[in-house]
Amino acid sequence: MVRSGKKAVVLAAVAFCATSVVQKSHGFVPSPLRQRAAAAGAAAASAATMFAPAAFADEIGDAAKKLGDASYAFAKEVDWNNGIFLQAPGKLQPLEALKAIDKMIVMGAAADPKLLKAAAEAHHKAIGSVSGPNGVTSRADWDNVNAALGRVIASVPENMVMDVYDSVSKITDPKVPAYMKSLVSGADAEKAYEGFLAFKDVVKKSQVTSAAGPATVPSGDKIGVAAQQLSEASYPFLKEIDWLSDVYMKPLPGVSAQQSLKAIDKMIVMGAQADGNALKAAAEAHHKAIGSIDATGVTSAADYAAVNAALGRVIASVPKSTVMDVYNAMAGATDTSIPLNMFSKVNPLDANAAAKAFYTFKDVVQAAQR
């Protein structure tokens, strides 16, 4: 049966659940072509869900199991190790993609930290059961991830969810859904789609109508002062970077999907341990910084400093061992040619000044680390 392009895009939301397990990589300061920080892939949660009857959350959990019945065959057919998930879903449009990323950040900033943490932990567990040539998680973990994401989405006002949907649709070539569907059993894809629609209705029943207030942001703290110093020293370097380049979408040389997944898992664990208010503040700082980005993809000096301060506070809220797990995992997956290549594209004096300032900032953050 022929589906409209828009309906086919909705079908991709089923795949999004597993894509979160296998493909999503988030960094603290990525280019406009990547999803921003932990906030982009995070979705949202709500106080309203916490105060609702226990059966409220169970209804989403039960619906997730039914979705699993309808979609797991489809999930097993998707090649989650395919490099296609690194590509733009159509014409490369960095600044347009950034608008979609911004909507994701806004949605993520509405998250209840407890539900966000639960979703991250569900993803971590699901990564542990990934197996087979296609890199699919177990059926039980598939259900648990979908349930966690359903609760997260239910905690966000519908308009925020639709903002993400609409903005992603604008940068997605209309031929993409049909192509992706051609890679799996059409019948299984249709069954998954119908299951997703039923799941969507259950989630929508519990959806909140308003988002929580903004995060609290410290002022005059040592990390904030150090972030200002870092930003002043590194802003010339920042302005020399080509943020609109497609290099950020290139796969790491010689690194398999499974190797990348191990590094991604360390990031998810770190995100799950971070302070919820600090994460929210970092997402809000990124959102504001996106608003001041110029035609070259560079944010204002003030917003750059605010983002650095926010990220410093996030990192300080996580044990050093967890941060080093991320560092070591990424170092092991990064060929030595990559830093040299990136270094060659900017003024080396400015790059060295930025690095020196970063090490000083790192020491201040570490001193505040729990």
Curated annotation (Swiss-Prot):
The record marks 123, 286 as: Chlorophyll a binding. This is Peridinin-chlorophyll a-binding protein 1, chloroplastic. Residues 1-57 form a transit peptide. GO terms for molecular function: chlorophyll binding. Its main location: plastid. Signal peptide: none annotated. SUPFAM superfamilies: Peridinin-chlorophyll protein. Water-soluble antenna for capture of solar energy in the blue-green range. Peridinin is an asymmetric carotenoid. The mature protein is composed of 2 almost identical repeat units. InterPro entries: Peridinin-chlorophyll-bd_prot, Peridinin-chlorophyll-bd_sf. Homotrimer. It comes from Amphidinium carterae. GO terms for cellular component: chloroplast; light-harvesting complex. It is found in: Plastid, Chloroplast.
